[in-house]
Amino acid sequence: MGTTTMGVKLDDATRERIKMAASRIDRTPHWLIKQAIFSYLDKLENSDTLPELPALFVGAANESEEPVAPQDEPHQPFLEFAEQILPQSVSRAAITAAWRRPETDAVSMLMEQARLSPPVAEQAHKLAYQLAEKLRNQKSASGRAGMVQGLLQEFSLSSQEGVALMCLAEALLRIPDKATRDALIRDKISNGNWQSHIGRSPSLFVNAATWGLLFTGRLVSTHNEANLSRSLNRIIGKSGEPLIRKGVDMAMRLMGEQFVTGETIAQALANARKLEEKGFRYSYDMLGEAALTAADAQAYMVSYQQAIHAIGKASNGRGIYEGPGISIKLSALHPRYSRAQYDRVMEELYPRLKSLTLLARQYDIGLNIDAEEADRLEISLDLLEKLCFEPELAGWNGIGFVIQAYQKRCPLVIDYLVDLASRSRRRLMIRLVKGAYWDSEIKRAQMEGLEGYPVYTRKVYTDVSYLACAKKLLAVPNLIYPQFATHNAHTLAAIYHLAGQNYYPGQYEFQCLHGMGEPLYEQVTGKVADGKLNRPCRIYAPVGTHETLLAYLVRRLLENGANTSFVNRIADATLPLDELVADPVEAVEKLAQQEGQAGIPHPKIPLPRDLYGEGRINSAGLDLANEHRLASLSSALLSNAMQKWQAKPVLEQPVADGEMTPVINPAEPKDIVGWGREATESEVEQALQNAVNQAPVWFATPPQERAAILQRAAVLMEDQMQQLIGLLVREAGKTFSNAIAEVREAVDFLHYYAGQVRDDFDNETHRPLGPVVCISPWNFPLAIFTGQIAAALAAGNSVLAKPAEQTSLIAAQGIAILLEAGVPPGVVQLLPGRGETVGAQLTADARVRGVMFTGSTEVATLLQRNIATRLDAQGRPIPLIAETGGMNAMIVDSSALTEQVVVDVLASAFDSAGQRCSALRVLCLQDDIAEHTLKMLRGAMAECRMGNPGRLTTDIGPVIDSEAKANIERHIQTMRAKGRPVFQAARENSDDAQEWQTGTFVMPTLIELENFAELEKEVFGPVLHVVRYNRNQLAELIEQINASGYGLTLGVHTRIDETIAQVTGSAHVGNLYVNRNMVGAVVGVQPFGGEGLSGTGPKAGGPLYLYRLLAHRPPNALNTTLTRQDARYPVDAQLKTTLLAPLTALTQWAADRPALQTLCRQFADLAQAGTQRLLPGPTGERNTWTLLPRERVLCLADDEQDALTQLAAVLAVGSQALWSDDAFHRDLAKRLPAAVAARVQFAKAETLMAQPFDAVIFHGDSDKLRTVCEAVAAREGAIVSVQGFARGESNILLERLYIERSLSVNTAAAGGNASLMTIG
């Protein structure tokens, strides 16, 4: 879609009027001018009367337009973004406004529209009852259909076995290697309670399937239960694998054939003849996933062309109503079918759609554009609009469009389509469906923190919407040919009576899914004389191979197996028919009486804002597919773009301006974002003095008040989201989606820490450290910066914030927000500058009581060494919380879905230009699928747009500066020189290519390595390394990953639970991700932080973090927090019991030492190692947080009482103690019970520091403690923290001896969310 800039001369007064009018409606002048032209043209084209122009314009209208001479103007940020905002007609604006409207508003509007008049309601109920009764009483379908329905009925999604069947169906047929197929079958079948299903179903097939899922490949009619039970177990074991593989494969293919009309279009057309003879019609759908590459899109295009030729010939002139048609999925025709890539969609996808439509016209067969996810609805309407006005298609009524009744926008979409049909002088075919992406729409809205759902949360509301929409469609027969796709007897009966008895061919039709709806519609399609209703039904018929069938099959299994579906309920003989065919309007009214209002959302589906329950609200996101949100954002970006931001020190006292240096946009050297300067030595000194003075004042502020201030800051930050987005885009090179996520994370941190302090802290018992230095990175200049400061402030500390020198402007805004929220001046201070100067001066100062650092492992080690000899007033070591990088891997086996893997790899490796500490660095692919996966990954990389992130189209922005770019490119060059295959790609156009030269861009890069060890250090940018592994060498691969010493994030893609358990159980990694991307940890949902070289802990956004920022708290403080959080979900403490066994032995042994025995019992009560907790999060995801013991704790004491105190603490968490090999310790060990002594290891005193250990407990004097801290800090490798105590002290902090593990599992990976689908 080419664009031209046309200049118009305006006087200053008119220009001001436009600006004022635009700002009044929160839009840009650019948008207003475009909208005005659009509306004027609209009226002109519709021959409406046009308003008279004021006299002063008449002369101007006759002026000849002068060409605008190009000028080298200063760079204007976000102008291109503003130009991408689309003008909207009134009806289109109404659609957008209804996107996420409150459910109560939407439902109450629908009720009257959907209500049937009493006579129609009575007739509809009677007919529905007859249809349902006949359906239930008819002899079970024979052959394949009956078998499959029996299976699905017996193994519903609420059973473990039903879910196992779904997982098998989703993965089995695509796995290329036998070993992984066997492992999947064993995994899914061995854990099921299959015996409980034996004999429950009257269907012989179901019982046979239960007995090993057709393990012999044929049906057996007699069973001996005892023998079969044994044989089932044997089959599940090794010996039966070939048999069971063959049987399960057959069962899965059988299920596939039930829902697919044919593997090829020719086969499908042949198979359709039988039902066509009974009066059915067909619409064919070519199966497959959405295209991710240009090659995928081309293959689908060819497939659609061939299908149209074949269907057209088979139609043989029957026409669009009587003959077969085709349904096309737009996401299959283009790899970037989304609002962000609007221009590409119009320039590249539209011509493909047009050529397919012209081909369909040539044969006069109907072509339906299928409905997809909610964020694609409006772009599909734009494509449809354009198609309807094509001169070559004038007067042809075969253009079809699918609308979804579960969307709140649906009634308004119908209004628009009716208007479009009228304007384009045609009759449109409109298929009304319920909607097939319900679970994923709920999940997406929750994850993105949007204001509501685009869909109804209760199925009965969708049923009401369907009736209201059906009435609207039937009301305009001259403009709309309605196609009612439903399997619900009441809906069918209602439509039959609403449409009236005087049916004529071409008035409307019903539709059903192949393999699901035929039994119902065999009562409808056919002559009245034969007892039928004489109404046509078109079968939606999928065509494709077993491999392409998977996603579609799981969707059907979900719909069939969901206990809310009509197909499932009709087969449930215990459900009264009256209930099954109830009028949905009456059902909603009944609910309204119980709940006090119509349209109350489902109680089990909280609004995204309320996702975390009462204690904390979810941060608000911004929908970048919503035209109104984009226009508002554009307006804010333009109005803030000319502001020259400043970053200078913020102290309690005013500071001088000093000499400022420009801050340059890394993507566009012409864009000076603002000005900044470094804090001077005297300013740093003043700030330190202020922090010391203000610390007692802030600590004396009640925790609830501190919390309220942080909550206020969260609200202010959310209010200023749009201007913060602009700053993040320009200063840090963030794309819009990254910038939104960053502001949200900062807001989440404020809410999370505020909530914990509000509920659990008391100034009498919880005492802060004092002045704390926060050193934050440039890659998350608002989120991590705010997170560190929020935690330190929440705990009652004064804060000295040293942001990264590359991103001081964002930091200055963050501080301004905190001060505005009520943090007193001097309690939080900003000291911009370099680490070597400002950072060094801060951390070297004895007044600093704690250091929080996020950055490189090397700098963290230096910091630890710098503060090692310093102790606080209580004689404790100064804490360092360090979060550093990682050599993060993702393991992918052959059971994973390649399309899903590629999407997650792109996000994990290249989002944020790879500049996340959690980013994927090494992709480990099982040999069997490596080539196939890499081919698709390379194709998908070539579709990514790299460029200025100030455009909506940009996927990948710049790296932070020229130094970073040089380091990354040096690494790529080194790998090339070594002969490693290097692939680089991004979608290129001339504008982008020019930008790549001037900004600091690095093209997404793929480098194939020979083994994992070849990568020696983290490469912080858009560079992904690939290693291949043999399925039998998975254990060795995990060992190699652990051997790197890093342990931040790890991903695994597999459908095999045993593999998930193996990887997550043996990887020494802080954050683990299963069947999803491995970036974007959410505060309180996936607490974030690594182990080993990747960080010291505790995890940010987790329950332990604030306790590390206190100098003193009660022994049970952590347990108070955990007990409060545990009220929502049960705790899994199985492992804890096992870990505590040695401590129990020590407790018994200490019978004659009452003080030790009491301490042992106290530690046992406090111990949390071996506990696993479920954390709140979005649907379709399972997030757990587990506390495990550190492996080995160095215990240093020269007194028996202290040595035993240390040992009790170590045993309480299940760790091993490392003792000095001397007479004192050997003698003590001899006296201990065997179970306790087994947990102690020895090393010579002179070699202690060379031993592996990951925590230290010390009892003794402060001089000795300093020496120990210095020696521990001088070691190579991971930073180890030291707990130091005076002799006789017993208040050891158990949480310092835990390792935290976060595990996030995408439970909807197999194609849908079974638990959400079954809630009703």
From Swiss-Prot:
CDD domains: ALDH_PutA-P5CDH, RHH_CopAso-like
InterPro entries found in the cross-reference section: Ald_DH/histidinol_DH (IPR016161), Ald_DH_C (IPR016163), Ald_DH_CS_CYS (IPR016160), Ald_DH_CS_GLU (IPR029510), Ald_DH_N (IPR016162), Aldehyde_DH_dom (IPR015590), Arc_rbn_hlx_hlx (IPR013321), Bifunct_PutA (IPR025703)
UniProt KW Nucleotidyltransferase keyword: no
Pfam families: Aldedh, Pro_dh, Pro_dh-DNA_bdg, PRODH, PutA_1st
GO molecular function per UniProt: 1-pyrroline-5-carboxylate dehydrogenase activity; core promoter sequence-specific DNA binding; DNA-binding transcription repressor activity; ligand-modulated transcription factor activity; proline binding; proline dehydrogenase activity; sequence-specific DNA binding
Assigned GO CC terms: cytoplasmic side of membrane; cytoplasmic side of plasma membrane
Keyword Transcription regulation in record: yes
Aldehyde dehydrogenase: annotated segments: 653-1119
Induction profile: By proline, autorepression and catabolite repression, and is potentially nitrogen controlled.
Region entry Proline dehydrogenase, spans: 228-574
EC number: 1.5.5.2, 1.2.1.88
Active site: E883, C917
Reactions it catalyzes: L-proline + a quinone = (S)-1-pyrroline-5-carboxylate + a quinol + H(+); L-glutamate 5-semialdehyde + NAD(+) + H2O = L-glutamate + NADH + 2 H(+)
Protein's pathway: Amino-acid degradation; L-proline degradation into L-glutamate; L-glutamate from L-proline: step 1/2; Amino-acid degradation; L-proline degradation into L-glutamate; L-glutamate from L-proline: step 2/2
GO biological process: cellular response to proline; negative regulation of DNA-templated transcription; proline biosynthetic process; proline catabolic process; proline catabolic process to glutamate; response to proline
Swiss-Prot/TrEMBL keywords: DNA-binding, FAD, Flavoprotein, Multifunctional enzyme, NAD, Oxidoreductase, Proline metabolism, Repressor, Transcription, Transcription regulation
Cofactor(s) annotated in UniProt: FAD
Signal peptide span: none
Protein family: In the N-terminal section; belongs to the proline dehydrogenase family. In the C-terminal section; belongs to the aldehyde dehydrogenase family.
Function field: Oxidizes proline to glutamate for use as a carbon and nitrogen source and also function as a transcriptional repressor of the put operon.
Descriptive protein name: Bifunctional protein PutA
Source organism of the structure: Salmonella typhimurium (strain LT2 / SGSC1412 / ATCC 700720)
